[in-house]
């Protein structure tokens, strides 16, 4: 897993992101937390928290 992605997510806590996973799912929400292996977002569509492993990420877009 790219250290650049981990660093960018950790620096983006509280920001809105669009996450594309390797299984072709996509989630849009606000990053609420991150550690070395996982990160959590508040999914805007379902209004629920989702936890993902960094290894599941194909692409991530951080929106300011």
Question: PLM features: residue spans?
Answer:
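Conserved RNA-binding domains used in RNP assembly and mRNA/RNA metabolism
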Residues: 2-64
């Amino acid at each position: 897993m790219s250290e650049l992605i981990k660093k960018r997510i950790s620096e983006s806590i509280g920001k809105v992101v669009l996450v594309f996973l390797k299984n072709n799912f996509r989630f849009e929400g606000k990053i609420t937390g991150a550690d070395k292996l996982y990160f959590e977002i508040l999914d805007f569509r379902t209004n629920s928290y989702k936890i993902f492993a960094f290894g599941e990420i194909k692409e991530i877009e951080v929106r300011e």
